A protein has these predicted regions:
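Short glycine-/small-residue motifs
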Residues: 120-123
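Vicinal oxygen chelate
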Residues: 1-8, 28-79, 88-114, 125-134
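Conserved active-site tyrosine of GNAT-family acetyltransferases
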Residues: 17, 21-22, 91, 118
């Protein structure tokens, strides 16, 4: 069985979403098969950005409405990086918000962030054997 994981992220503006994810993490836009949907590749995953209006309903049977200010969700991306400070700098320059940095020299440091659309993600520094940064 062959499996592929695709991560789908709602954004209020497709062009801004593509700009952020390509600049922050090096994704490349592969297709825009229909209006309001962009397919990006990078980091060994396929990322689909879906343009969805703020205030629209995310599914039938819920009173929830889409909102793009910072929000909590039980699902987020962990992006493992060799150089945390460089990756964090690129993400912030592209529009990410750094919320907290957790320094752990023995196991790898991490930065808790959100994208410009309120979705949380973590940057986690890879460590080599012996505890040194990768």
């Amino acid at each position: 069985m062959t499996s592929t994981v695709t991560i789908s992220i709602d954004v209020p503006n497709l062009e801004q979403g593509v700009l952020f994810y390509t600049r922050a993490f090096g994704f490349t836009k592969k297709a825009e098969p229909i209006p309001g949907l962009a397919v990006l590749h990078g980091l060994n995953v396929e990322l689909c950005l879906l343009e969805k209006a703020p205030g629209s309903r995310p599914s039938i049977g819920t009173s929830d409405l889409r909102r793009y200010e910072r929000h909590w969700t039980p699902v987020h991306m962990d992006i493992h990086v060799d150089d945390l400070q460089s990756a964090l700098g690129r993400a912030i320059e592209a529009g990410a918000v750094k919320e907290q940095v957790f320094e752990n020299p023995e196991h790898g440091s991490a930065a808790f962030c959100s994208d410009p659309f309120g979705h949380g993600f973590c940057l986690i520094e890879r460590r080599k054997k012996g505890g040194a940064a990768a």
